[in-house]
């Protein structure tokens, strides 16, 4: 079983709740990243695949993404990271992740799974007794975020936080395709069997974290679509319900929103998790089927502008 952990990147609300230091602007990293120029009936915009978490020592952005940001007068993200009440959102997420008072996590999980979870929680520094009041989806995110942080990958260094801070300084408005409440409700509405599958994969793959994160970061910077698809989509073959809920339905809603946009005088930059740009149900493929044309931006093209 392979690397489903990478797929939680697209839904980690910690992106919106982290500290946001001011990252110095850079000339961009050497690879092309994952950036498209999209043309359609309502004008031109950029579509970029993001890494919500990056390593603080490797936080520079690909040159095509830098170009897309410079050329855009507004930013569209999964959620509006500039308009979130952090304390309120954190409280809602914690409340949503709580088990019902009468529920018992050890009984819901079974003895073997509970033992493995308790060991993983202890290794990550969490109190198992307190954590036992959370639903499996919340525990999956907790363990994943802790594992990312141990390897130096943080949302404070991630693409959204960097561009949020820059957009504030550059007076570029930010909007969201969804709200934090919508993402919380999506996770909290997952069937318990799906949540158990999520937790199983998280526990199985924690040991692979260092290699997986570095491979994912390298593939994203290189714009290596086959490798990104292998890393990000492979686990969904055995979890079709999760794939439909987290990817297919959301991508289709976003395409509907994009098609409803009024024509703008200058381009927007649409920035979503890289997971949403790969595969037959990825945004580029869906937009093409909706009559849009897409063109990958290269390093040479970015340098020539």
Where are the regions a protein language model picked out?
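A cross-kingdom marker for long, charged
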Residues: 241-305
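Structured, acidic catalytic/metal-binding patches in enzyme active sites
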Residues: 32-246
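Cleaved targeting-peptide boundary
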Residues: 25-32
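Positively charged n-region of N-terminal signal peptides that target proteins for export
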Residues: 2-4
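Alpha-helix C-cap/termination motif
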Residues: 7, 68-71, 261-264
């Amino acid at each position: 079983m392979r690397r489903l952990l990478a797929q939680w990147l697209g839904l980690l609300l910690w992106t919106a709740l982290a500290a946001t230091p001011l990252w110095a602007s850079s000339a961009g990293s050497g690879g092309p990243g994952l950036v498209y120029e999209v043309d359609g009936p309502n004008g031109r915009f950029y579509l970029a695949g993001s890494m919500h978490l990056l390593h603080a020592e490797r936080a520079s952005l690909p040159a095509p993404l830098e170009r897309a940001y410079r050329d855009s007068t507004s930013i569209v993200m999964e959620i509006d990271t500039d308009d979130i009440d952090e304390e309120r959102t954190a409280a809602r997420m914690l409340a949503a992740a709580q088990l019902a008072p009468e529920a018992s996590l050890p009984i819901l999980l079974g003895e073997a799974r509970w033992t493995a979870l308790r060991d993983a929680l202890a290794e990550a520094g969490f109190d198992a007794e307190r954590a036992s009041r959370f639903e499996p989806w919340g525990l999956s995110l907790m363990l994943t975020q802790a594992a990312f942080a141990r390897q130096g990958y943080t949302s404070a260094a991630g693409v959204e936080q960097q561009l949020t801070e820059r957009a504030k300084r550059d007076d570029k408005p930010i909007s969201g395709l969804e709200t934090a409440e919508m993402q919380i409700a999506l996770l909290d509405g997952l069937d318990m069997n799906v949540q158990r599958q999520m937790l199983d994969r998280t526990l199985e793959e924690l040991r692979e974290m260092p290699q997986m994160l570095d491979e994912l970061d390298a593939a994203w910077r290189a714009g290596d679509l086959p490798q990104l698809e292998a890393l990000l989509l492979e686990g969904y073959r055995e979890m079709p319900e999760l794939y439909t809920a987290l990817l297919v339905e959301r991508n289709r809603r976003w395409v509907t929103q994009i098609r409803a946009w009024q024509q703008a005088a200058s381009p927007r930059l649409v920035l979503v998790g890289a997971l949403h740009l790969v595969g037959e149900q990825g945004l580029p493929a869906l937009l093409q089927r909706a009559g849009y044309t897409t063109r990958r931006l290269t390093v040479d093209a970015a340098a020539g502008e």
